[in-house]
């Protein structure tokens, strides 16, 4: 089944911050657009949806604009560079992060979740009768990295909006 993008702002079923057309337009101005244009539309859509899911694993300042919205943006009650976030649009840096992460995921589908651990370089450790053999080139099945560890450049796009890293247990304190 072909992937379908829903980029409705504050949408209950939204699964992307951008449309495929917006992403294609962005990469038309990119120095290395071939790493995007060599993908099928379905691969691009799947990568955009996946990028949104990973971006939404992070914790952000402010509040969702609508309790029923599926995605973490748009947000309000927070300013970046003295400008209040608006409920009527997605910040450009969030879109840029999605474009670049989608391209990265389209070109390395195992970068975050790892491979199954069946291929690659194996190491063996032996202690008496105990022997352990493991793969050094991949992660075990089900293992998930912090998105910012895998793609630290995302911090440049998302840092101004983030409360903490992925799965952060930090709490916002309001004095007054």
Regions found by a protein language model. Give the residues of each.
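Divalent metal-cofactor coordination and adjacent catalytic microenvironments
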Residues: 1-176
